[in-house]
Amino acid sequence: MSFNPELATKTLEAEGLRCPEPVMMVRKTIRTMQDGEVLLVKADDPSTTRDIPSFCRFMDHQLIAAQTDELPYQYLIKKGL
């Protein structure tokens, strides 16, 4: 699937933040969302390329798409499976 930020119902700007802040903010934001909603995360911390996919697996959310070829990194996360 190609990366389509228009799928997002919410956006989280995490640029300039360093581990573990981006993932903590993703967790806090997703808690306020309904199942099926999609979060667009923008970050520039290289650790997010590892941490966000792991977070999604561990917390049973779906990483719909990731763009990690250039900054800012962008992730589309669907709440729930």
From Swiss-Prot:
Alphabetized GO MF terms: sulfur carrier activity
Family as reported in the entry's similarity comment: Belongs to the sulfur carrier protein TusA family.
Gene3D superfamilies named in the record: TusA-like domain
The entry's keywords: Cytoplasm
Main localisation: cytoplasm
InterPro entries per the UniProt record, alphabetical: Sulphur_carrier_TusA, TusA-like, TusA-like_sf
One Pfam entry name: TusA
Protein name listed in UniProt: Sulfur carrier protein TusA
Keyword Cytoplasm: yes
GO cellular component entries: cytoplasm
GO BP terms in the entry: tRNA wobble position uridine thiolation
